[in-house]
Amino acid sequence: MRAAELLGEMLAGFPESQGLAREILICEHDGDQLTHEVVKRLNQTFVTPIDREDILLLASALDDIVDFTEEVADYLGLYCVEAPMTQAQAQAQVLIEATRQLQEAVPLVRDFKDISEHTVEVHRLENEGDRIVRAAIGSLFQGGIDPMVVIRWKDLFERLEHAIDATERAADILEGIVIKNA
């Protein structure tokens, strides 16, 4: 969730906030380390309360969210973006809320509690993100915009969409874990 919040701050304060890309990269490295630690512990643990494969799938899915988020921050700099489009800021807010829902759902899975309130909201947010990206890409092609700007922003919008889609994948995995263990 921290990486998503930092991306939201980065887009809200751009270009002055470009330095936040470094903090997002640190979050990405921390996520990778955590995923490696999960794998290490799974290899050392004989019995787990949840299927080992499900734990690994969930850890990987959560790491993907951070990876995609960091990718967006990196490409903002690589593409020399001068100012963010409002639709990118809206997508970042969707990403923040979806990661917040996942953050609230994950602890509930330990006791196999009902997480549907959170996963349904993640699915709703993913649909909202889809609507935002379609409208954003459509607005790029309404004329009068430099073709290089169109190419850059189309790619950035799609990368943001990948991060949001990854939250839905994580929610699906959480739902599967609860169903398996109910």
Predicted regions span which residues?
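Cytosolic, long alpha-helical scaffolding segments
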Residues: 1-182
